[in-house]
Amino acid sequence: MITVLDVENTTCKRDGKQHFDPFEAENELVMIGMLSEDTETVVTFTHSDEEPTVGGDVITQDILDATTLLVCHNAVHDLTWIWECGFKYDGKIYDTMLGEYILNKGVKSPLNLGFVSAQYQLEEQKLDTMSDYWKSGTSTKDIPFDELDEYLRYDLRSTLGVYKKQMKRFANEENSSMQSVLDLTMDTCFELALIYKRGIKVDMVELNKVKTEFEEERATLSEELNEFVEELMGDTPFNINSPEQLSTLVFSRKPTDKKQWALSVNAFMSDSAFKDAMRSMTGPVYKTKASKCFMCNGTGMVQLLTKKGTPRKNKNICKECNRQGFTLKNTKELAGLKFTPPKATWASASGFSTGKGILETLEATARGKGMEREGDFLQKLRRLNAIESYLSSFVGGIEKFTKADGMLHVQLTQHITSTARLSGRNPNMQNMPRGGTFPVKRVFISRWKGGKIMEADFGQLEFRVAAYLSQDKTAIKEVLEGFDVHQYTADIITKAGQAIGRQNAKMHTFAPLYGASGYGRTPAEAEYYTHFMYKYRGIAEWHKRLATEALSDRKITTPSGRQFAFPDVSRRRDGTVTNFTMI
């Protein structure tokens, strides 16, 4: 029996974040709606105006026991709620949200039920009043029962309608290759729901220790960096966490008119045009020397007099120093590290970029020229940025989303990316550095006494997959021999004049596998991309075949049967293809 299921539940707000899951003690299951063989069943559990359905637990479980395919829109949410409330279901599922995601073939489009239903021109019309209730802070269980009941029944009928429409589309010959992808996606969805429900245990005491370690390291780094900043910039007030101010320190220049600069500079302009823009639209930054403001005597405030010559009741802000208590004098000595941005890809709307990759390149350049202090400064700056990220993304995320029972339920979603890659949220733990030395990993413990946690990772997975798909003979030979491609990448770039380690070289190993070129990169990095296309000619030819397929068919079908659409792809005058890295 096919059963469409949807739940209505309350939510709560904690630490500025709205929580929809059943793991929060405050959240309650309000209603479950089920539609089977034209029979609608709505079971009420906790509504302010309606008594719970007599025997509701038994009714719900009986329907689930008779179900062979459970259809939902956002199945992870619905499955988690019914499981956490004690109901059992381990049969097949179909998620209409994921079905639509597959049929979209990589083209971004809203996946909410209202939008998808409208796309299929279903007769049911969704109630607009629900969003008004929720925006006003009304709890789901306090929404008038008749309106909530109608809303739930609409969702059931709409989900069923979408399911039937999708089944017809998957049956079409043009989409038939995606049937195996559909089956795998739904099986994966079920397993991801189980992973989400089970969660992982967090040692909050250890988390606080890690937080303290990071905060202490941040304080030490900030102090050391600010000492050198004062040496580089003089007495100019400086916030090392400001990308705009950091840009002036690193490149010793800033736009004279930021608005005009942002309008004039783009990543595709020629190197000569960029250099001309930099000469005409930016100016040098000089060190300053501070002296006590003579107008306010260093207080930042001045006492003005009335027309009668008596002091005014309130003091005014000193216009000479703008309340700072000091004025700055230009020393005519160039400030900062004096690096020169080589090309337009290094520009930003407010000056020049100081992203991770650029700082890595500049550090290597500094050390290559024997500028060890500058290299150390840039290394510490990158470490400070990493610490800030660890504290906000990992420590802060774990603090915010760990439940009262010490369990963290990280969700891996299947419908966010265009490529079908899983993405993490609440919090996203996918960017956690590899290796057992990363301190945050200490906070995850087994829920069982004496239990262990195993960490597993594929080695050079992208390279292996590219070797197989392209059947590149050189790449296959290196995979079989255990060749270290990341170290090879590092060696090529280093020999070309830019020192780089194996870990930082990985991004350059991966990038050409996805069709990226050396455009916009440093000369040493660009050397590797040229070398890659020559050495791995089979991969390069494979990329060209994909581009040709996208041009001729407006889509690409992968070996698994998944399809990706490229409705706007075109060939440029120079022979290259737009959207190449996406292809």
Label every PLM stretch briefly:
Residues V485, T489-I500, G561-I583:
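Generic long, charged, amphipathic alpha-helical segments
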Residues K92-M97, L182-M186, I500-A511:
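Alpha-helical scaffolds flanking conserved acidic
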Residues L5, C72-H73, I93-M97, S446-E462, ...:
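Conserved catalytic palm subdomain of right-hand nucleotidyl-transferase polymerases, strongest
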Residues L64-L70, T236, G450-I453:
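Short active-site oxyanion
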Residues M1-K17, E24-G33, E37-E40, A118-Q119, ...:
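Conserved "right-hand" nucleotidyltransferase catalytic core of DNA-directed polymerases
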Residues V76-F87, E100-N104, S247-P255, G459-T474, ...:
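Short active-site loop/helix that positions an aromatic residue
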Residues M34-N172, L184, L192, Q487-T494:
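Active-site-proximal helix-loop-helix substrate-binding element of RNase H-like nuclease domains
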Residues Q411-A499:
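Function-dense linear segments that define catalytic or interfacial modules
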